[in-house]
């Protein structure tokens, strides 16, 4: 939490001002075919508009192969051109959700993924599910003891 530059400066002077969140985070990779194999040509994966990025959900999206470009968009019933995100490769972004539990964090991440509209976008829809079965074993060994699935 806070400004990383400030807590790094404080650390240089022997002060520990780093505040760490105890929230659980889940990240969902949003890509285009044929990620992760990267056999698609640049022509096939660049300059595709990324719709649905808003000032509200932008802070949960870490852009990767993304650029700003003038793209077609609808304004009421009129076709207009505006500056927006467009694809610049096949690994587009990581959408992050945080919460008190793994399930809540995943639900929040997928809510933002659902806001995005990208032609042929692909993503896994099972992020965080496997840990439901594995978490008790990890906790028996002393790991993730404060973590909850639901």
Segments predicted by a language model, with ranges:
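Active-site "cap" helix and flanking loop/linker of ATP-utilizing ligase/carboxylase catalytic domains
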Residues: 1-63
